[in-house]
Amino acid sequence: NLKKIFSVKIFIVYAFVSLLYLFPAFKNMEIFGFYDTAFHINRALSLESIFSSPINFETFRSYGMQVNNFYPWLTLYPLFLLIKFTNLAIGYNLFLYIVTLITLFICHYVMYEITKKHVTSSFFAIIYTTSSFRSVEIFLRGAMGELLAMSILPLILLGFIKLYDSKKESWVMLAISMTLLIYTHVLSVAMTMVMIIIALIIQFYRKKKIEIFLIIKLIKAAIVTLLLSLAFIGPMIEQTLYQDLNRPYVDILQKRAIYLGKEFLIGSIDSELLSFGIGL
């Protein structure tokens, strides 16, 4: 099935698109991002001791932070390997290139499974992968967790759609993709669960009935996801219950909310990355 979807031509096109998209970083081999970049690089470097201890005293100014117990690291581990076998700049930008290329392939696969059209799939893949929100994550915020989560979200969409498939194992993709998301970015998991619940409510109001087969598949997916994610969820819960977490600052998000008016609409269609919009 994958051979039918992907050809050498598609691979070459997406390899070129990824290189063109990340050309500003590769041109002078710079590390972009001004907000979370240092945090995520330190997170990646701290994985050198992850299989012996989640706490690394060589990073984060030797504070011995518990970050790896509370922030999933599995999908970030390749970044550590790339940095280890090259150097910081090459490893970081090469990781961005690989993630961008994989995102293009995932988006193409997801849309092709839905539409069976290569042109539509290519348009979706390129628009999603080069969207302003994803560009902000790379070139401004350096939010590696959210960036990796964005690569997985299309698979979750497809997994949810496949729940309506008559095949008994159609829930497997949702379980696997949700597990990957849990091992990548916890906040995205919470947001995704909210969106799934909203979609189910809308579907219920449309059909005016509860579809038992759908509920059964969701329960199966949830159980398998939970079991596959215990390696992260277990230690996180254990550490949360074991000790109090003190936060130096608690923000009031309501004060920073964006008004969905003229400014938001204009920001959605202009070419300024720093403006607030729908993320395209």
Region roles according to the model:
Residues 1-280:
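Membrane-embedded transmembrane-helix bundle of lipid-linked glycan/lipid transferases
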